[in-house]
């Protein structure tokens, strides 16, 4: 189980990313449309003004049950070892173990 503070920090980053998403997208669109380099630098400075934690690259996917940030399966939202345990316990409908 991940520390509560790390899970809370990740949720805070998600809220910030949602809040500043439209601002970042509009500034990036402006940068791509303007041909002059000096104006691009000015807009790039504005792009750096939102908080650092509002950038989408700072987000991690976390396991739904344990909060583990690594080895997550996007389809299930679970980490690898929790996914394996749930499949073995038949708690995930439609998921089967591989056999060949």
Swiss-Prot record:
State the InterPro entries in the record: Ribosomal_uS14, Ribosomal_uS14_bac/plastid, Ribosomal_uS14_CS
Keywords, sorted A to Z: Chloroplast, Plastid, Ribonucleoprotein, Ribosomal protein, RNA-binding, rRNA-binding
Subcellular localization is given as:
Plastid, Chloroplast
- Highest taxon of source: Eukaryota
Q: What is any Pfam family matched here?
A: Ribosomal_S14
A Gene Ontology term for the protein's cellular component? small ribosomal subunit
Q: Name one GO molecular function term.
A: rRNA binding
Q: Name one GO biological process term.
A: translation
Where would you say this protein principally sits, based on its record?
A: plastid
Q: List the disulfide bonds.
A: none
Quaternary assembly: Part of the 30S ribosomal subunit.
Physiological role = Binds 16S rRNA, required for the assembly of 30S particles.
NCBIfam families (alphabetical)? PRK08881.1
Note the PANTHER family from the entry: 30S RIBOSOMAL PROTEIN S14, SMALL RIBOSOMAL SUBUNIT PROTEIN US14M
Family note: Belongs to the universal ribosomal protein uS14 family.
* Name recorded for this polypeptide: Small ribosomal subunit protein uS14c
Q: What is the lineage of its organism?
A: Eukaryota, Viridiplantae, Streptophyta, Embryophyta, Tracheophyta
